[in-house]
Amino acid sequence: MHNEEIEPILLESKTIAVVGISDKLGRPSLTVSSYLKDHGYEVFPVNPNLSSVAHTPCYPDLKSLPVTPDLVVIFRKASDVPDVVREAVATAVPKIWIQEGIVSEEAYRMAEIAGMAVVMDKCILKEHARLVREGRIKKGHD
């Protein structure tokens, strides 16, 4: 995915599910989740092993969310990503972001075939911060 294709994904998304979130300080999933909340996104933590993260209810899976999120950000090992994408397809999520360092060609193809916008092996925090620096996205995500 090219940089110009990333901007609309971030601008059009208001609700974001973070799959594989950790409640441990310093973990990338928690840092990214906090950053996204601080920039105006409504974030839904997803991890079947946690009941809450940073005073926010945590959901066991995508189908348990109270809304269909605009975007799912995945922090899972590559072998788990296809199952997350299958669930996202089943719940009609329109956009998938497979976080930096995670590569699953199977999941990427699956998302594309389902008509989803998909980003893989890029950090959503870094990409958002770059667009803020460039003045292309407002800091508060209006």
Language model features with spans:
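Mid-chain, well-packed structural core segment of small domains
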Residues: L62, P66-I102
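Conserved beta-strand elements of the Class I
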Residues: A17-V19
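Short N-terminal or domain-adjacent regulatory/targeting segments
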Residues: M1-E12
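NAD(P)-binding Rossmann-fold cofactor-contacting core
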Residues: S22-R27, S34-A54
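A short helix->loop->beta-strand "cap" motif at the edges of active sites that frequently abuts
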Residues: H39-Y41, T91-I96, A114-M116
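A charged, well-structured terminal subsegment
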Residues: E127-D142
